[in-house]
Amino acid sequence: MRNKKIILLSFFTILFFASHSLSEVKHWNQIDSDDLTQVEIKDNYYALFKHDQAELNKIVTQCLEVIKQDNDIMRNELKKEWKRAFLKSQDTWEKLIESDKKVIEYDHCGGSGTEIFILKYQIDKTIERIKELKERFCLN
């Protein structure tokens, strides 16, 4: 009878530690999948960023071409005003690109992802502003 109790107690002890170990493995797997999700979010963001950057670079090139040529649609005063506004937006964009690189580096070192989404919003707003300027001055 005593041997049965010892065997039963040993069995439940092993069962307890085995279930505890499994829950630890599950916990670490959950953390790994959460980290993977963060990496996927960063990768998706970076892909969007690259797409927006390419789109903006295309618009920038078109706009600079219009600034360089004489265009009857745009009177000189409008052209000057647009050029000032455009160059200011372009400057903002370049600063955002530079700060974005710093944020991505910071984020890879364990920083918060919040800054990335704030920058994405700022980048989107800058793109909208440049597109508005482009439409306003008939640059489509």
Predicted segments, located by residue:
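A ubiquitous, low-specificity "background" feature that marks scattered single residues
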Residues: L9-F11, S99
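Bacterial N-terminal signal peptides that target proteins for export
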Residues: M1-L8
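N-terminal signal peptide c-region/cleavage motif recognized by signal peptidases
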Residues: T13-H20
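N-terminal alpha-helical modules
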Residues: L22-N140
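Enrichment for repetitive, rod-forming helical segments
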Residues: F11-F12, R136
